[in-house]
């Protein structure tokens, strides 16, 4: 049975049982506790926690999941995977234990002709929590399973909670007996290789309390409504129904291995080392495609770093299989074809996915070869010195110069029997490894922990947001935190966090920064400087009491800084229009990857399918400003997600949407799902002026623009600058480009003449340098440091002149010049030396690391640079050694 059919049978079984079929959530959700979605219940957490009412009593989903805690183990065995699918059914105060058992057992044991999976019930076992006697009795009642195939386990195995105070409950697992071939008799408590878990049923019935960590979180009561959360491992069921040993042989994964076999000419199963590489490719290709599909782009922080690490492990594994051409696009296409029946969006988004992955591959391949040579030399030096640990400085160089993630260096070193000085690496990376975005997010989340905010939400309910229509409102203080601790009052000068019953203040979200403003009441004044949604539905106002004493239950007049808010709204509306214009220019492949809307200025990141040209961006600016002339009304309304999609509304990758969504329309030109605030008519934007564009990551481009009066002031400054230049050059403004081009041309000619004079002066030393040659196994080597400040062009000319003066004898010329903290070097090899197999480009890696650099070139001439002038003497010695070895090898 194919995996897609397994999924179809699952959702159809539960649909017939009255469950709402909910699509898989994005792998990226707005949950600060999770890097990626790693379980089916994650998108339903607000309902289980009571943060929001469940919109349906029963639900079912096939959730895509990524777990990256054991990336290094992937491939070494067949057990580990980073991507998997979790099929689940969920009850929110509806059916409980008995119903969950009936649904699971029915699907597993019904015949395939009747829509089930057709498992032999005699080969199914179950486990229950040791204190859950009710579950053991119900299993026998519901299924008729004999008592000897029901095993009890302690809380470690069969009790679920979130690790913090909140809901919890016993769980019950269903296992399949694969037979004597796989291990000992006696059920899952004896052998979990033979008895494989396929389904876990969690019975959420308890409230877990707060105690010191070592004592856990014991039950302190029962939940008012009992819930069900189950998860069936799709890949495990696929293995059993397809009669294969592990996930790598199933219909969704084996095709990727087959493609790797085709590209490499090697066979899976021939030897362990290659099998590890095949499995790394197969697993990481699936994770990579699904993560990029959900809007993750390779980077150096958080999710982007994990994705980059996955993709670069694929690239290295393919090279170890002997494939040196770009391959990520090939693997991505195989994953798309295999997964599309369950995730059709992979087809519509494939051009973007393919572009992001290929761009990352191109970027890494450009440095992988050079970096690998540096690594090999470092390994050789370490072993030669009798060491067992690669220096932290070398790991840092590989990361900083060649883009090697530390994990890749650790893995490569381990393959060579070496460890890495991680402490030294971390010290060198201390500044670069500060994750600015995460730090900013943690600063904004306030002082209290999440349980404090959840308690406030439970006590007072969600905050009523009035800011779509009102910038002033009467509000009441429901809660007050000082240094994260609930307080009754706060004196002047105190930084506080406020919970209001209703607020006109917008909480940061969707790229729009938070409102600021004032709260005033009898004898008290408060300055609001930030607003965050600490937990869904709860607005936390970060503020400072500037006068009087603030207390809980105080009534206040809340007033948003209206001038600032309107400037932010202009920026946010401009972002929507720029997004529409970018999609008009590049198509749907240009998906939003991030935005920031602040007063008078907007920033928009998008995935670029190709290089972004200035001409296209100029067209984007013109199209936006042209549309502003229509002054259409901006409309917002709430509708169902399905209806919004029918209307063509653009949903953003990584965002979590409910059944009801807010749509912002700007005529037929722009229609997006958005919870932010906007202008009433687009004419209020005035003008949008693009002021910067740049690349901010693999396949991600950023444009920045000024809006309204900020844009007008910028244009006025530019006009004044042009006027002054025209006056200076004594030409009309329209002739400035031609006049400036002429001046630049004359300047370049003068610089060229000056360079020729410098070269002529440098060449005077050629005869002296040629006389300093030494013999290395019949090859004349001239390796010298010339005066400081000689640039690469002059060095090349000098090396060529010296090489020519050495006649027909095999010769190698290497010249170095320092300039401050930089080093330039050139290596020249004459034809007789090339006939001996010597090549300039091949000699560079033998010494470049000593000057902290790299280089390359052709057989006759190579050049490069570095950042360690103090290493020139060592570099010359290393070159001599490298030449000695190269000549000896012949």
Swiss-Prot record:
GO CC annotation terms, alphabetical: cytosol
Q: Which SMART domains match?
A: tRNA_SAD
Question: Where is it localised?
Answer: Cytoplasm
Question: What species is this protein from?
Answer: Saccharopolyspora erythraea (strain ATCC 11635 / DSM 40517 / JCM 4748 / NBRC 13426 / NCIMB 8594 / NRRL 2338)
Keywords, A to Z, come to: Aminoacyl-tRNA synthetase, ATP-binding, Cytoplasm, Ligase, Metal-binding, Nucleotide-binding, Protein biosynthesis, RNA-binding, tRNA-binding, Zinc
Question: What's the protein name?
Answer: Alanine--tRNA ligase
Quote the SUPFAM superfamilies the UniProt record gives. Class II aaRS and biotin synthetases, Putative anticodon-binding domain of alanyl-tRNA synthetase (AlaRS), ThrRS/AlaRS common domain, Translation proteins
Q: Per its Swiss-Prot or TrEMBL entry, what cofactor is needed?
A: Zn(2+)
- Claim: RNA-binding is one of the keywords in the record: yes
What is recorded about the protein's domains?
Consists of three domains; the N-terminal catalytic domain, the editing domain and the C-terminal C-Ala domain. The editing domain removes incorrectly charged amino acids, while the C-Ala domain, along with tRNA(Ala), serves as a bridge to cooperatively bring together the editing and aminoacylation centers thus stimulating deacylation of misacylated tRNAs.
User: What does this gene product do?
Assistant: Catalyzes the attachment of alanine to tRNA(Ala) in a two-step reaction: alanine is first activated by ATP to form Ala-AMP and then transferred to the acceptor end of tRNA(Ala). Also edits incorrectly charged Ser-tRNA(Ala) and Gly-tRNA(Ala) via its editing domain.
